[in-house]
């Protein structure tokens, strides 16, 4: 347990940031799930819409420090590859 007042405050701040980051990560996963659901349905138009909604959401998470930029780039690349395969 934190002994000094500043350490106690740091613990509180970390807990608050953890909640925010968990919500952001969950939101990104929800957008990814919508994309995969559209892919499973075979609907190209809804998959494109889901992809266009997913990409800025994950980049927003990168700018907030939730994901590393390479992780986001890899996820976007893989989803784009799946979208392209659907349209062929």
UniProtKB/Swiss-Prot annotation:
GO molecular function, one term: small ribosomal subunit rRNA binding
An annotated GO BP: translation
UniProt keyword list: Ribonucleoprotein, Ribosomal protein, RNA-binding, rRNA-binding
Phosphoprotein as UniProt keyword: no
Database matches in Pfam families: Ribosomal_S20p (PF01649)
The keyword rRNA-binding is annotated on this UniProt entry: yes
Coiled-coil spans in chain: none
An example Gene Ontology CC term for this record: small ribosomal subunit
Described purpose of this protein according to its UniProt entry: Binds directly to 16S ribosomal RNA.
Entries under NCBIfam families matching the protein: S20
Family membership: Belongs to the bacterial ribosomal protein bS20 family.
Name this protein carries in UniProt: Small ribosomal subunit protein bS20
């Amino acid at each position: 347990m934190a002994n000094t007042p500043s350490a106690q405050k740091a613990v509180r701040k970390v807990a608050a940031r953890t909640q925010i980051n968990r919500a952001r990560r969950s939101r990104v996963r929800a957008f990814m799930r919508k994309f995969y659901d559209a892919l499973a349905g075979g609907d190209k138009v809804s998959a494109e819409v889901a992809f266009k909604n997913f990409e800025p959401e994950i980049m927003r998470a990168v700018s907030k420090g939730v994901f590393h930029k390479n992780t986001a780039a890899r996820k976007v690349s893989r989803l784009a590859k799946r979208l392209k395969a659907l349209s062929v």
